[in-house]
A protein has these predicted regions:
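Extended, helix-rich architectural segments
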Residues: 1-99
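Structured, contiguous alpha/beta core segments that scaffold functional sites
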Residues: 79-171
Length: 171
């Protein structure tokens, strides 16, 4: 479905040109139109939080930790969730701020135990201005860093987010 969203359709790519008639093609991407309208409609108003217990401190904490996130975060998250059926949010700390990165299912994979708890999360990525593929593996204690051949390129870093849980959420 992601290919269709990007405009790579079978109808256009496998089109047989015929010289005895007009070959004008109308390429209207209704899937992209539908998803973009769904995202715009769902997120037209700012997301607000309320506490069932009436605890304003929790609401203030949520707003404090998410105020520096990208303005497009919620729309990108919903768009990828609609396209793939689910996606991931990876949480990390940078410059003493809680950050989040959206990971598409084409770039990451998780493994659950029989109770539905996430045990591992694998993420494949490229660094800026490099063609090499890197893999990070997250578990409850460490983050392991590998190259595309699963050769360790750095010592594991301590996973100190989420109190002993894998730092992802599945959306």
């Amino acid at each position: 479905m992601y290919k269709y969203y990007k405009g790579e359709t079978d109808a256009i790519s496998n089109y047989k040109m015929v010289t005895k008639r007009s070959n004008n093609k109308i390429n209207t991407n209704f899937l992209k139109k539908f998803i973009n309208e769904e995202v715009a409609y769902s997120l037209a108003n700012k997301i607000t939080y309320t506490s069932r217990l009436g605890d304003e401190k929790i609401i203030n904490d949520l707003e404090y930790y998410t105020c520096h996130w990208s303005k497009k975060h919620d729309s990108d998250l919903l768009r990828y969730t609609l396209l793939f059926g689910f996606c991931y949010e990876l949480y990390y700390v940078k410059n003493n701020e809680m950050k989040v990165r959206i990971i598409k299912p084409t770039d990451g994979c998780h493994y659950e135990n029989e109770d539905g708890e996430t045990i591992y999360f694998f993420r494949e990525f490229k660094k800026d201005f490099k063609d090499d593929i890197y893999i990070d593996v997250y578990d409850k204690e460490y983050i392991y860093h590998f190259d595309s051949n699963f050769k360790e390129i750095e010592k594991p870093t301590v996973n100190n987010i989420f109190n002993g849980n894998v730092p992802i959420s599945i959306c």
